[in-house]
Amino acid sequence: GKEVDVKYFIKAMVILMTITIFVPAALAEQTQEERLEALCTEGNSTACFKMGERYRVVERDKKTALKFYEKACDAGYMTGCTNGGILLAMKGTPYSKDFKQARKMFDKACEAGEDPACYNLGTLNYKEGRQKKAIKYYKKACDMGNQGGCAKEKRLKR
């Protein structure tokens, strides 16, 4: 009868609407990631940084995150240098090549005015037994308003 047809019609419409709403959302997410990756490949530092964040936070893939942070850093996105340096420092040990690379990344960002990078340079130097250098970088971070840097400088100067 006609009543059955109407019920099927309504069911079909609901299913169609559901598909129409959810499928493009999944595709849009995929294309946003692809778009970011393409922009990063073209040298867009912000896109590289966002990809680094995505891999660090969402995917929990530090190795891939580091690649994107390094690209962001090379393209002039200083927080990419800082975050990449942090991943390297966490992975490495004093005097390791990871520490050496972290130092380079922190140095670039610190010189550009990123106080967390200066603070982290203080910590790297401290871990490698370079107290005077550690104090210098903690002071630099402190002068930029980094309270942690002020506290560490004060403690080490005693």
Go through the PLM ranges and name each one:
Residues 140-158:
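Terminal, low-structured helical/coil segments at or just beyond the last alpha-helical repeat
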Residues 12-21:
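Bacterial N-terminal signal peptides
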